[in-house]
Design a protein with these regions (language model features):
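Conserved G1/Walker A P-loop phosphate-binding module
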Residues: 1-73, 272-276
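P-loop NTP-binding site
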Residues: 185-188, 197-204, 218-277
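Switch II of P-loop NTPase G domains
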Residues: 56-59, 76-103, 107-126
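Short loop/turn segments at strand-loop or loop-helix junctions that form parts
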Residues: 29, 75-77, 136-142
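Canonical P-loop GTPase G-domain recognition
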Residues: 142-211
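Alpha-helical scaffold elements adjacent to nucleotide-binding pockets in ATP/GTP-utilizing enzyme cores
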Residues: 40, 99, 116-123, 164-171, ...
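Short glycine-/polar-rich loops that comprise or flank the Walker A/P-loop
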Residues: 69, 98-103, 129-134, 176-181
Length: 277
């Protein structure tokens, strides 16, 4: 029933979404905890942790494929080491910027020296980076004052630490304006990682949402986040259908029939989402 060109456009878009390979940048100064956060979020150990500052000297592409889905993390070198390195990093970041679906920017919750990060963030905005593609995360939440009160049994901050984290979060939100809230995490013990995953899935562009979700560790998933990924998938297919139909001039009765067909196709594909991703 569907015109061949419309059918072909929908199939092409469906294929591109199902096989989309997301690219996420992980930024932050050396020692911010980038590798630990990656390992806490995703199914595979995608970044090698290292105790020494400055261990990431260049952008490392970490492409992994636990099943049929490919995804790439770009582990970006830390800022604020030396002026010479920062200049090199700026050129590198400008080159990589267009291909990144999202940039997760990691700042230590237990320090206040954010000047290098602020300067680099402003530079990227001046280079045309989309502000809505930045997600700011506070790492090492377990080390904020008073660090000795961290609850090792429950793996969560004490009441006093919660107040400290609220203060730091508010300050960082002011220094780094973003479309999304700043989240504190303690990656090694998994504290607040599911909340970060939820925020990340909402921050991703529509074509990347389902593909990224398929790489998330099981303990970080939730029914609500999965429904969002499914809904976003359906919306992208619907938009593809609408764009294809808009290329033609159809009579009113045909448009009404096409709308019904559109809804059936979306419902079917969303139902099959578990099998597609």
């Amino acid at each position: 029933f569907l015109p061949e060109e419309i059918r072909q456009k929908i199939l092409e878009h469906l294929h591109s979404v199902i096989h989309y390979e997301p690219v996420i940048g992980i930024m932050g100064k050396s020692g911010a905890g980038k590798s630990s956060l990656c390992n806490a979020i995703f199914q595979s150990r995608v970044c090698a942790t290292h105790p020494l500052n400055g261990c990431t000297r260049q952008a490392h592409r970490l492409t992994f494929q636990p099943g049929e889905r490919r995804m790439t993390l770009v582990d970006l070198p830390g800022t604020g080491e030396t002026p010479q390195h920062d200049q090199e990093y700026r050129a590198l970041y400008s080159q990589l910027l267009p291909e990144l679906d999202l940039i997760i920017w990691i700042l230590r919750a237990d320090e206040r020296a954010y000047a290098a990060d602020i300067a680099m963030h402003q530079f990227l905005l001046n280079e045309g980076a989309d502000p809505s593609r930045f997600l700011f995360v506070l790492s090492h939440a377990d080390r904020v004052f008073p660090a000795e009160e961290w609850n090792d049994t429950e793996k969560c901050p004490s009441r006093h630490q919660e107040l400290s984290l609220a203060t730091v979060t508010a300050r960082v939100a002011t220094l780094f304006p973003s479309s999304f809230p700043v989240l504190p995490v303690a990656a090694p013990v998994g504290w607040n990682i599911p909340a970060l995953v939820s925020l990340m899935i909402h921050a991703l562009p529509p074509q990347a949402t389902s593909a990224v979700y398929s790489h998330i560790r099981g303990e970080n998933r939730s029914e609500r986040v999965q429904k969002h990924a499914q809904q976003t998938f359906g919306e992208t297919i619907g938009k593809s259908f609408d764009d294809a139909v808009a290329r033609f001039s159809f009579p009113a009765w045909m448009l009404q029939l096409l709308r019904k067909t559109r809804d059936r196709i979306i419902h079917l594909l969303v139902t099959l989402w578990d099998h597609l991703f």
